[in-house]
């Protein structure tokens, strides 16, 4: 069947086309079936139907399909396509049967090529979430995710990297770790994510200082030139299957454990990382609530790294309260830059950054065992980390002379006050993050929260314990209402509650 194309200027995250019901009936296809579209290119797409959005003789195509045919001004040939063999692989996984390496390669390739529907992707995610995967299957999945995307081969070795499991607000340590490590002669090309559910991923933060979107070739050039990089991995086409899985996982609110392992390690493998430190924050509001779960995750990451030829060490870190006192892109970058400029900043930020950078310095041979943290702190104190950060900013197209005081935060502010005398006994990290997001972070770079009192600090009734920053007044109102309702910082006196006796006073 030959059909004219009509472009729907909408991105839906998959290859999908819209038939008029009459054309679909004539071709013998139903919603969810596949067709192959041939013009100057040939791709497969998933069928949907409509009675009136497109007329007979016309095929409605969304942006992901249209980009393959935007230079094609003739009708396209459309024929029914066979269901992908990956559907059978997914069924095997649902039936809790083992799968072969070639089957996983086929599955990942179909994910990248948009040959699977959201229903099929959801089934794959559900199967791995419920039944898990063997060590072999996780390794094969990781290798397939690496092989179906860009890879970078650096000329300088060893290649260092770090990753945080996340879940802790204010975790800006990469802005310190990368320049510390690079300043000591080690290569650390840090590809990072943007926030999905957080108030700012490392890429969102670095974007305050410089561009972060570069091709794989540009990342190599930048890192080789100055020893490090802080870039957004999404612009590199590294492990593209991961982004396609995340799109389906997000509305389901699940993150299958073994896919998480593969996702993390695929991104490290794609840049040729040889020594990797994993930050595993532990706490009730983090992704890893207990030390026991953290130890299991550490063992699994180390084992998978060994299978892939990577040396992986894990740091189980305190995650019950924010890192530093600022959450949100500009606020966090100001805090990190102050540490680089003068070592002024929260102890939690300095200590954690130095500890993780120290592990990398030891792994890379720049410091003797148990002396890495000392070297990391000295690199901050002597200004070498700041100088290296300026070089990275300049290499990525930013202003190397920018100072912490130059970074502007949201103009609209509101404070949350303590309702009683006492001490800070608890943080609800999830609500801290949500309040910062409601204020506009990470898209509004100046939005976020400033935390004035940390765990164990004394508070007087009426003290400001939290300040909300926003770039838009209506977002400030929304964040303030939520903060007042949820009470994300818990203050209690030494006397928590008085319980009277049976007879009371005589």
UniProtKB/Swiss-Prot annotation:
Reaction(s) this enzyme catalyzes, per UniProt: AMP + phosphate = alpha-D-ribose 1,5-bisphosphate + adenine; CMP + phosphate = cytosine + alpha-D-ribose 1,5-bisphosphate; UMP + phosphate = alpha-D-ribose 1,5-bisphosphate + uracil
InterPro entries: AMP_phosphorylase (IPR017713), Glycosyl_Trfase_fam3 (IPR000312), Glycosyl_Trfase_fam3_N_dom (IPR017459), Glycosyl_Trfase_fam3_N_dom_sf (IPR036320), Nuc_phospho_transferase (IPR035902), PYNP-like_C_sf (IPR036566), PYNP_C (IPR013102), Pyrmidine_PPase_CS (IPR017872)
PROSITE patterns, per database record: THYMID_PHOSPHORYLASE
Residues bound to AMP: 167, 193-198, 202, 263, 287
GO molecular function, one term: 1,4-alpha-oligoglucan phosphorylase activity
Active site: 255
Any one Gene Ontology cellular component term annotated for this protein: cytosol
Enzyme Commission designation: 2.4.2.57
Function text: Catalyzes the conversion of AMP and phosphate to adenine and ribose 1,5-bisphosphate (R15P). Exhibits phosphorylase activity toward CMP and UMP in addition to AMP. Functions in an archaeal AMP degradation pathway, together with R15P isomerase and RubisCO.
Protein name: AMP phosphorylase
Species for this entry: Methanosarcina acetivorans (strain ATCC 35395 / DSM 2834 / JCM 12185 / C2A)
């Amino acid at each position: 069947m030959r059909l004219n194309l009509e472009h729907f200027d909408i991105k839906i995250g998959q290859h999908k086309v819209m038939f008029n019901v009459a054309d679909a009936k004539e071709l013998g296809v139903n919603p969810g079936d596949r067709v192959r579209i041939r013009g100057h290119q040939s791709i497969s797409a998933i069928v949907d139907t409509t009675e009136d959005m497109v007329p007979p003789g016309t095929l409605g195509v969304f942006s992901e399909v249209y980009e393959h045919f935007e230079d094609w001004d003739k009708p396209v040939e459309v024929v029914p396509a066979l269901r992908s063999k990956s559907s059978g692989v997914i069924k095997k996984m649902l039936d809790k049967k083992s799968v072969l390496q070639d089957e996983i390669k086929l599955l990942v390739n179909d994910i990248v090529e948009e040959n699977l529907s959201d229903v099929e992707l959801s089934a794959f995610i559900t199967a791995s979430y419920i039944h898990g995967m063997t060590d072999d299957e996780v390794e094969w999945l990781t290798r397939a995710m690496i092989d179906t995307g860009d890879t970078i081969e650096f000329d300088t070795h060893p290649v260092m990297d770090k990753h945080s499991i996340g879940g802790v607000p204010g975790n800006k340590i990469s802005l310190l770790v990368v320049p510390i490590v690079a300043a000591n002669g080690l290569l650390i090309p840090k590809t990072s994510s943007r926030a999905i559910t957080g108030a700012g991923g490392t890429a969102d933060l670095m974007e305050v200082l410089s561009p972060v979107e570069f091709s794989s070739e540009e990342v190599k050039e930048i890192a080789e030139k100055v020893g490090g990089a802080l870039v957004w991995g999404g612009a590199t086409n590294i492990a593209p299957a991961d982004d396609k899985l995340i799109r389906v996982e997000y509305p389901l609110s699940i993150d299958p454990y073994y896919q998480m392992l593969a996702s993390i390690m695929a991104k490290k493998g794609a840049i040729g990382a040889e020594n990797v430190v994993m930050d595993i924050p532990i706490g009730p509001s983090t992704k890893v609530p207990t030390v026991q779960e953290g130890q299991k995750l550490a063992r699994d990451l180390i084992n998978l790294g060994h299978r892939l030829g990577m040396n992986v060490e894990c740091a189980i870190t305190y995650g019950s309260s924010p890192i530093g006192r600022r959450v949100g892109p500009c606020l966090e970058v100001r805090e990190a830059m102050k540490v680089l400029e003068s070592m002024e900043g929260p102890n939690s930020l300095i200590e954690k950054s130095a500890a993780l950078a120290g592990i990398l310095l030891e792994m890379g041979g720049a410091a003797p065992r148990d002396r890495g943290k000392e070297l990391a702190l000295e690199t901050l104190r002597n200004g070498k980390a700041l100088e290296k950060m300026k070089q990275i900013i300049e290499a990525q197209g930013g202003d190397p002379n920018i100072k912490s005081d130059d970074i502007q935060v949201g103009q609209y502010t509101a404070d949350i006050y303590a309702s009683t005398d006492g001490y800070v006994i608890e943080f609800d990290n999830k609500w801290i993050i949500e309040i910062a997001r409601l204020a506009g972070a990470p898209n509004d770079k100046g939005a976020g929260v400033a935390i004035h009192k940390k765990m164990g600090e004394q508070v007087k009734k009426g003290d400001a314990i939290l300040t909300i920053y926003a770039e838009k007044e209506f977002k400030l109102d929304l964040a303030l209402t939520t903060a007042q309702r949820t009470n994300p910082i818990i203050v209690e006196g030494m006397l928590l509650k008085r319980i009277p006796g049976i007879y009371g006073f005589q």
